[in-house]
């Protein structure tokens, strides 16, 4: 029986048998006086204050760069502007920023860290670890963890862990939206702060279990398993907290990298259903204890505000448009494993590096997939998307025989916060379909290059096969024609690295070529010069020769896999440099570490003021 396992305190009081005695009541008051139950709600505020400080510092950084970029003389009206920062303050700022980037731009081994769900960026990792350490210290340093008897009140460790978990729920939901106020304040798009959403969820789960375990342990310590069973039967299951922690564990399991990788579409649909169940059950569990439900009230207000803003500005409820108005996209296969989607006329303003979510109106209508967009050269005013066939939606799209698809567009999202016009040198580094992110920067800023601070734009694109270049053949031809002199002057440099040389004659007839090296591929020196594609028939050769004379020296095609670290170190670094990369994990790993190393030039060379990196990927 329970009485046989009744904890006796040093003063002789029994935690179970004496629960109604006057001495028990007096000891309970003393315990509450030493560690007030009501004070534990302050720990939720401590977590909120810490996150608010991080957001505030990030906001200051964003505003500082906005002011710094706007003070640059990249427009005639900015010449000799009195708002230009003082030289002394500018030097201090650039050195501090370079030191920060020297550390934060570095990358951990992608394969290991991504598999474990750990941030690969050193900067992101440090923020996550600082938040984790802060919350752990605030939870476990204060004592006592337990009260002498459970009847004296809930274990202090449980209460403060629970209130800390609830305070984190607000940030978990706020960080989950494609449009979110935190991302707007700190100047980061949702896909970049999604890692903070994931880790806030992990911390919330951890503190939820810290909240649960002391209750179970103290009940067992005082009266054994029978006491635990008795307290379980006496509580309302829906009120007990079991449903919310069950939902939270299911959310965590379904969000593991391995689950997202293999069951991404199931994860997307399951995620929001579990989140709704978690929120409702948690509200029922905590109301009205310590006013903690107010965190959840604030959460739902912010979340719905973000959702309605997204639907009205980016989504299907835009003013002046029909509800969920669809559009037609042309579908075509442009190479092995690659699909091209072109929307001829788009009523949407977008910037280089942004992406949209595409939903096809067919059996895949529940699926919503992100794709980078860039202007179509074939259809002025239209947008183009390159989609690599992998699994799920992209594979079905590639294998379909449809020439057109009716789609819903949600977006645009993402992009770069900095003003590209304030830099002197822009380096675009990409692999595969990552060209979708980098090419629009060249398309937009190439024609206005001399109206800005920009001096050089360099594009380095790594592809597997030579025929992959046909993905953007129209766009490259248009740029070569319109900006021919800039190409010849070396103001615009385009290099394409072909890792596996597999010429397809039919693809290259109209592609602008640069030098006659196809006849002597064994000459190593020729590989570093402009390379052309060969033709087998006389008519094609004649066409090619004319094209070659017109575009000679414009595009460099190198039939070898590049050492990107060496490529970046060989750049002629300018005064203010912007690196934009998009592509594989290995590419972003190399570029991140290389640009981190370039920060040393800011200290050693007075002619180098900034090396800024913007990397793009859909890693969520």
Swiss-Prot record:
InterPro entries on file: FAD-bd_8, FAD-bd_FR_type, Fe3_Rdtase_TM_dom, Fe_red_NAD-bd_6, Ferric/Cupric_Reductase, FNR_nucleotide-bd, Riboflavin_synthase-like_b-brl
Record-annotated Ferric oxidoreductase domain positions: 161-320
GO molecular function: ferric-chelate reductase (NADPH) activity; metal ion binding
Catalyzed reactions: 2 a Fe(II)-siderophore + NADP(+) + H(+) = 2 a Fe(III)-siderophore + NADPH
Membrane topology per record: Multi-pass membrane protein
Binding residues for heme 1: 197, 271
Binding residues for FAD: 369-375
Composition bias type Basic and acidic residues, residue spans: 523-532
One GO BP: iron ion transport
Topological region Extracellular: 1-45, 129-167, 216-237, 287-292
EC number, as in UniProt: 1.16.1.9
Triggers of expression: By transcription factor MAC1 upon copper deprivation.
Residue ranges annotated for the FAD-binding FR-type domain, each copy included: 321-419
SUPFAM superfamilies: Ferredoxin reductase-like, C-terminal NADP-linked domain, Riboflavin synthase domain-like
Chief site of localization: membrane
Gene3D superfamilies for the chain: Nucleotide-binding domain of ferredoxin-NADP reductase (FNR) module (3.40.50.80), Translation factors (2.40.30.10)
Similarity-based family: Belongs to the ferric reductase (FRE) family.
Protein name: Ferric/cupric reductase transmembrane component 7
Native source species: Saccharomyces cerevisiae (strain YJM789)
Taxonomic lineage: Eukaryota, Fungi, Dikarya, Ascomycota, Saccharomycotina
């Amino acid at each position: 029986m329970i009485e046989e396992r009744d904890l006796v305190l040093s003063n002789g009081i029994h935690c179970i048998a004496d629960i109604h005695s006057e001495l028990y009541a007096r000891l309970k008051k003393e315990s509450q006086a030493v560690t007030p139950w009501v004070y534990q709600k302050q720990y939720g505020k401590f977590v909120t204050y810490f996150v608010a400080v991080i957001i505030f510092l990030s906001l200051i950084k964003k505003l500082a760069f906005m002011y710094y970029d706007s003070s640059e003389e990249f427009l005639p009206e900015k010449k000799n502007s009195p708002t230009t920062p003082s030289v002394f303050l500018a030097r201090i700022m650039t050195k501090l920023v370079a030191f920060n980037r020297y550390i934060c731009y570095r990358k951990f081994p992608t394969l290991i860290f991504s598999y474990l769900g750990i941030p690969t960026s050193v900067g992101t990792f440090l923020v996550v670890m600082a938040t984790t350490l802060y919350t752990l210290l605030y939870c476990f340093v204060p004592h006592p963890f337990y009260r002498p008897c459970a009847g004296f009140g809930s274990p202090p460790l449980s209460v403060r862990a629970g209130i800390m978990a609830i305070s984190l729920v607000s940030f978990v939901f706020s960080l989950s939206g494609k449009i979110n106020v935190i991302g707007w304040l700190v100047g980061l798009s949702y896909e970049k702060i999604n890692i903070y959403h994931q880790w806030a969820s992990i911390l919330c789960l951890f503190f939820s279990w810290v909240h649960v375990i002391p209750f179970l342990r103290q009940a067992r310590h005082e009266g054994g398993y029978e006491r635990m069973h008795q307290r379980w039967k006496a509580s309302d299951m829906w009120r007990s907290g079991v449903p919310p922690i069950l939902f939270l564990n299911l959310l965590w399991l379904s969000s593991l990298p391995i689950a997202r990788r293999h069951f991404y579409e199931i994860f997307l649909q399951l995620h929001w259903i579990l989140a709704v169940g978690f929120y409702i059950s948690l509200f029922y569990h905590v109301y009205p204890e310590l006013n903690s439900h107010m965190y959840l009230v604030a959460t739902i207000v912010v979340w719905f505000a973000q959702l309605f803003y997204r639907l009205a500005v980016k989504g299907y409820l835009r003013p002046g448009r029909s509800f969920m108005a669809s559009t037609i996209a042309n579908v075509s296969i442009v190479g092995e494993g690659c699909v091209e989607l072109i929307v001829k006329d788009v009523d949407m303003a977008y910037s280089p590096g942004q992406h949209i979510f595409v939903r096809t109106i067919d059996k895949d209508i529940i699926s919503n997939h992100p794709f980078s967009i860039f202007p179509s050269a074939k259809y002025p005013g239209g947008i183009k998307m390159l989609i690599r066939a992998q699994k799920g939606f992209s594979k079905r799209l590639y294998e379909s025989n449809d020439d057109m698809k009716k789609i819903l567009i949600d977006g645009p999202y993402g992009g770069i916060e900095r003003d590209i016009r304030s830099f002197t040198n822009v380096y675009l580094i990409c692999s595969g379909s990552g060209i979708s992110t980098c090419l629009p920067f060249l398309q937009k800023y190439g024609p206005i290059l001399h109206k800005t601070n920009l001096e050089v734009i360099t594009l380095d694109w790594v592809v597997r096969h030579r025929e992959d270049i046909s993905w953007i053949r129209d766009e490259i031809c248009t740029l070569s024609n319109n900006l021919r002199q800039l190409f010849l002057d070396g103001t615009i440099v385009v290099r394409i690295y072909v890792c596996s040389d597999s010429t397809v004659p039919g693809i290259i007839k109209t592609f602008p070529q640069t030098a006659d090296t196809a006849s002597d591929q064994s000459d190593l020196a020729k590989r570093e010069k402009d390379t052309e594609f060969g033709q087998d028939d006389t008519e094609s050769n004649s066409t090619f020769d004319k094209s070659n004379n017109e575009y000679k020296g414009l595009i460099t095609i190198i039939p070898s896999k590049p050492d990107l670290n060496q490529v970046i170190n060989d750049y002629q670094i300018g005064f203010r440099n912007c690196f934009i990369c998009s592509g594989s994990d290995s590419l972003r790993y190399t570029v991140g570490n290389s640009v981190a190393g370039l920060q040393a030039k800011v200290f050693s060379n007075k002619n180098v003021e900034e090396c800024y990196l913007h990397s793009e990927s859909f890693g969520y």
